[in-house]
Structures are given as structure tokens and as C-alpha cells.
Curated annotation (Swiss-Prot):
Taxonomic superkingdom: Bacteria
Binding residue positions for Mg(2+): 173, 193
All copies of domain OBG-type G, residue ranges: 160-340
Record's keyword annotation contains Lipid metabolism: no
Name the record gives this protein: GTPase Obg
Residues bound to GTP: 166-173, 191-195, 212-215, 292-295, 321-323
Record function comment: An essential GTPase which binds GTP, GDP and possibly (p)ppGpp with moderate affinity, with high nucleotide exchange rates and a fairly low GTP hydrolysis rate. Plays a role in control of the cell cycle, stress response, ribosome biogenesis and in those bacteria that undergo differentiation, in morphogenesis control.
Main location, first listed in the record: cytoplasm
Pfam families membership: DUF1967 (PF09269), GTP1_OBG (PF01018), MMR_HSR1 (PF01926)
OCT domain span: 358-438
Top class in the EC scheme: hydrolase
Keyword field: Cytoplasm, GTP-binding, Hydrolase, Magnesium, Metal-binding, Nucleotide-binding
């Protein structure tokens, strides 16, 4: 029998976008063929999909890392790189996706429901797409962007119409076994059931599922025992059925006190899906009380005595024996009617594909703050500047010049001047720090040089901080000029 795993931490990594290509078309009798480097392919996404044949999160327990494939690099002759293949991860029906802070990102209910857990990075532009009047044959291309990488928490909440609640050894597993064809483990000791058991029950034209939730004890809502793990599985149940052991010999226990204790735990528990399950709060769910083990004479007398008091709360009461199968028929009909009424009031939604929307590409806002670690330095933050930094190959002067032009058009250079930045000041954007120098914008009269170079970068011959310090010490006579 396979292990039942209902909570895992999954690390997902989308594919990286492929780099663009910088190439020039070469053909006989065409000395000026022009740029023909194509764009890189997009990285693959990581997608969670509900599959009817998957019933546990066991695979993710043993394989907690999932990575999609990268996009391919572009090539010459305008051959675009292939996109990375999406990674499809199959999850069971009822999987809830949360971030590491416990916020619900997606509630996957219904076969075919999808959630884009991580989006692949965009491919870099090739030099054919970067050609302009100022750069007719760019000697550079843009790098592909990294894909989204994040940690997700997957929790499985059983998708059942009726949840059977009760203390350990109340006979819940026995009831599931006689109502359906399920064969749960049954034994005469507490906590025999450690995972929810699902059974399919047919009553006339109605078919519904019953979940045997492992036994609850006082303090379960605060995590005592395995309470939180057990209570999680009742969040989707439309009907809550209290299974009461009328034959218990435990001191201080009776049907009324057991019901009160179970209701106290339900009232204290805060479901993660309270607003998203569509079923309302737990205290508003329909209730039914099942007085079990009435094949024992003393239990039958006790059940008859407490029935009026329970019915006074407005809950239907059924007296049964899972062993002798007495009273099962009216119970099955009643549960079927309650489920049928719920389904009519709550039509089943169509499976939805839930997607994480990336930040808008047209977001041109940015901020500039003084660098607390470097005197006279500045830190630039913004969606576009940080993306452009990641796309730039800094071993290519022409690519660096293109980056400078983009930042200038965005207004970063003017904003640095207004902030008091001096030539040679340290500027940090993303993970890159550099000495800032005002540059002349590239125009159509830009001096032609070799591909991959930018003459504007050669015009700066500013001495560094160490050289300035050395010059001051020479002027003061502290060092020889040749030292």
C-alpha cells in the first residue's frame, strides 16, 4: 500500500530564456547583407494540473525539485531558438497551493484545473531585432531572462461530500466499509486510521463520496495530536456527520459531551480556505449525528435517551450499528438528500486555469536612493532598469553602450544628475555596480568602429579613486612621484 502524503514543499524553477544571436548575413555578391541574428526561445513553464488518477502528493515528497527546460539560443539566418518545453506536474483533486507565508495562491478542484506555478524567462532579442538607424548592424544581442524560481507549499484537502467526524475508535472506518466498497484498515485500538479513507456511496440516482477523517481529540484545533492535519480534510465537506460511540467505557465521556467537544474543536479551527471553498464557515455546514454501536444493549438504551436532546439542536439523529448494519438504509437516504440539496444550491464550477501574471513590461517607473554602503554612490531600483541589466552582456562594449542609451531615454541619467551624482560615482542597478559616466546619446552620426565596440566608452580616461589618492600624497610630499 502506497504512503499517503498530504503536505509537501515543492521548489519550482521555470526555464531560462535563450540568448539572442548576433550574426551578419553572408552571401556571395552581397557584401552588406545586414544583421540576421534571431531571438532566443522562451523558457518552459511549470504547470500544476489536476489528474483523476493521482490521489496523493507522494511523488513530490521524494522529488521536491521541479525544473522546466531552458529555451534554445537563436541562430543566424533568422532562425529563432526553440521554446523550452513546459513541465506538467500532475496533482490530486483538492490540492491547495500556498506560498511560504501561508497565503493561498490557488485552489485546484476539478479534473483539468491548472495553475501556472512558474513562468519561463523571455528569450533575448537577436541583433536583427535591435537594428536601427544608429546601429544598422549591431554587434551584440540581448541575453535571455531567468525563469521564475520559488518555493510552494502543496496541501491536499480531501474532496468529499460527507465528512465523518468523531473520537478515535468511534467506528468511522467501519461505517465507510459498510456504506461503500472501500476497505480501510479497521482494528480495536485508537488512531488505527492515520489518513483519510474515501468511499463512494450510491443511493438511488445519487452517488456521493464519504471521507473517514482520522479521530479527533480535545485540543486538535491547536495542533494537539495530529489535529491540524486531520481537520484540514473537512474543509471541503458539504455535510459534517458526527459519529458517536455509544458503547464507550471511558470515564467522563457520553454522547452529549463528545458532540460538544467535537463542536468546540470545529469552532476553534480556522480553515485556510474559509473564503475560497464556496461552502461557508464550518459552523454553518449541515450537521447529522450518527449514534453508533447500538448492537450493544446498554448503548442502544443510551442512544434512545440522548436522542431528544440532540434533536432539540435541530440536527437529524440516526441510530445505527456498523457491525450488524442496522439503520444504514435510512442514513444513506438522508445523506444522499442532503448532498443532493447542496449540489443544487452550489453548481459545480468549470475547471479554471489560474495564471501568475508578470509585472507589466511597460512599467517605466524607477527610484534612486543614496547607497548607504558607498559614499557618493546611488542605488537605482525599477522593473525596466533591472530587467535591462540582466539582459546585457557586459563583456561587449556595444551592448553596454546600448544599455546606457536605454537608461538615458528612460530618464535615469537626468535623475542621477538631479540627485547630485558626480561623474565616476558608483551606481548599483540590480546585482551590478559600475562607475557612472554621462554619455552622448548614440545618433545616426555615431563613429563607425568594429562590431561589439562603442567609441563613447573609449573617450573616458578618468583616473580611479586609488590614483587620485596617490596624486594627493605626492603633492603633499608624502611619496615620491615615481613610487
Amino acid at each position: 500500500m502506497s504512503r499517503f502524503i498530504d503536505r509537501v514543499v515543492l521548489h519550482v524553477s521555470a526555464g531560462k530564456g535563450g540568448n539572442g544571436c548576433a550574426s551578419v548575413h553572408r552571401e556571395k555578391f552581397k557584401p552588406l547583407g545586414g544583421p540576421d541574428g534571431a531571438n532566443g526561445g522562451r523558457g518552459g513553464d511549470v504547470i500544476l494540473v489536476v489528474d483523476e488518477n493521482i490521489h496523493t502528493l507522494l511523488d513530490f515528497h521524494f522529488h521536491p525539485n521541479a525544473k522546466a527546460t531552458n529555451g534554445k539560443q537563436g541562430a543566424g539566418s533568422n532562425r529563432e531558438g526553440a521554446n523550452g518545453e513546459d513541465l506538467i506536474l500532475k496533482v490530486p483533486d483538492g490540492t491547495v497551493v500556498l506560498d511560504t507565508d501561508g497565503n493561498v495562491l490557488a485552489d485546484l478542484v476539478g479534473v483539468g484545473s491548472r495553475y501556472d506555478a512558474a513562468q519561463g524567462g523571455r528569450g533575448g532579442l537577436g541583433n536583427a531585432a535591435l537594428a536601427s538607424k544608429a546601429r544598422k548592424a549591431p554587434g551584440f544581442a540581448l541575453l535571455g531572462e531567468d525563469g521564475v524560481e520559488r518555493d510552494l507549499v502543496l496541501e491536499l484537502k480531501s474532496v468529499a461530500d460527507v465528512g465523518l467526524l468523531g473520537f478515535p475508535s468511534a467506528g468511522k472506518s467501519s461505517l465507510v466499509s459498510v456504506l461503500s466498497a472501500a476497505k480501510p484498515k479497521i482494528a480495536d485500538y485508537p488512531f488505527t486510521t492515520l489518513v483519510p479513507n474515501l468511499g463512494v456511496v450510491s443511493s438511488g440516482d445519487t452517488t456521493f463520496t464519504v471521507a473517514d477523517v482520522p479521530g479527533l481529540i480535545p485540543g486538535a484545533s491547536e495542533g494537539r495530536g495530529l489535529g491540524l492535519d486531520f481537520l484540514r480534510h473537512i474543509e471541503r465537506c458539504a455535510v459534517l456527520a458526527h459519529v458517536i460511540d455509544c458503547a464507550t467505557l471511558d470515564p467522563g465521556r457520553d454522547p452529549i459531551s463528545d458532540i460538544d467537544a467535537l463542536e468546540a474543536e470545529l469552532a476553534a479551527y480556522t480553515p485556510a480556505l474559509s473564503g475560497d471553498s464556496g461552502l461557508g464557515d464550518l459552523d454553518k455546514r449541515p450537521r447529522v449525528v450518527i449514534l453508533n454501536k447500538t448492537d450493544v444493549p446498554e448503548a442502544a438504551e443510551l442512544a434512545e435517551m440522548v436522542t431528544p436532546e440532540i434533536e432539540a439542536r435541530g440536527w437529524p439523529v440516526f441510530t445505527i450499528s456498523a457491525v450488524s448494519r442496522e439503520g444504514l438504509r435510512p442514513l444513506t437516504f438522508a445523506l444522499a438528500k442532503m448532498v443532493r440539496d447542496y449540489r443544487e444550491a452550489h453548481p459545480k464550477p468549470e475547471p479554471k486555469r489560474q495564471v501568475i501574471r508578470p509585472v507589466k513590461v511597460k512599467d517605466s517607473s524607477f527610484t534612486i536612493e543614496k547607497d548607504p554602503d558607498i559614499p557618493g554612490g546611488f542605488v537605482v531600483r525599477g522593473t525596466r532598469p533591472e530587467r535591462w541589466i540582466r539582459q546585457t552582456a557586459f563583456d561587449n562594449d556595444e551592448a553596454v553602450g546600448y544599455l546606457a542609451d536605454r537608461l538615458a531615454r528612460l530618464g535615469v541619467e537626468d535623475a542621477l544628475v538631479k540627485k547630485g551624482a558626480q561623474p565616476g560615482a558608483s551606481v548599483t542597478i540590480g546585482d551590478v555596480s559600475f562607475e557612472w559616466e554621462p554619455m552622448t546619446p548614440a545618433g545616426i552620426d555615431l563613429t563607425r568602429t568594429g562590431r561589439g565596440t562603442d567609441p563613447r566608452l573609449d573617450q573616458v580616461e578618468r583616473i580611479g579613486a586609488d590614483e587620485r589618492k596617490h596624486a594627493r600624497r605626492v603633492r603633499r610630499g608624502l611619496l615620491d612621484e615615481d613610487a
